[in-house]
Design a protein with these regions (language model features):
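PRPP-associated nucleotide enzymes
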Residues: 1-153
Length: 153
């Protein structure tokens, strides 16, 4: 779908998720593009907002193309085409380490004075501003399932 901008997309998404209004959902944004969207959705649904930190693993020679992703715990998702894109074990190990360091720095930046909100037993809605390969969403959902939300949307 095409939207005028991220805020317009967030407003339409909040409308589609209206059944969760007043149920204190936890809206988790995949930074950076989804953060303003999650703020709008959290306000409309009367929920809390936080971030879920994941990073794409970039293809060799093509940093915009995801060959996989990593979550904050270090769990790695690799697309079945990663090797065909030129990513060998050493490249994946180094790229994973680099992205985990970025995640560590972003955790300090996004939640410097408090721990992340705990999704356990809560309705959790994950927001991203696009799903080109779906890699970062796969990692985000994997990370969140391990934390036992009541519902994961």
């Amino acid at each position: 779908m095409i939207f005028a901008d991220r805020i317009a997309a967030a407003e339409q998404l909040a409308e589609a998720l209206a059944e969760y209004r007043g149920r204190q959902p936890l809206i988790l944004a995949i930074p950076r593009g989804a953060v303003p969207m999650a703020q709008v959705i959290a306000a409309r649904l009367e929920g809390e907002m936080d971030v879920v930190l994941v990073r794409k693993l970039r293809a060799p020679g093509n940093p915009e193309f995801a060959i996989g992703s990593v979550d904050e715990s270090g769990w790695v998702y690799l697309a079945d085409y990663a090797a065909a894109a030129g990513a060998d074990e050493a490249y994946i190990r180094d790229e994973t380490a680099a992205q985990l360091e970025t995640i560590r720095q972003r955790r300090i930046q996004y939640t410097p004075v408090r721990p992340p909100h705990d999704p356990a037993g809560r309705i959790v809605i994950v927001i991203d501003d696009g799903l080109a390969t779906g890699s970062t969403m796969i990692a985000a959902l994997h990370a969140l399932r391990a934390k036992k939300p009541a519902e994961l949307i």
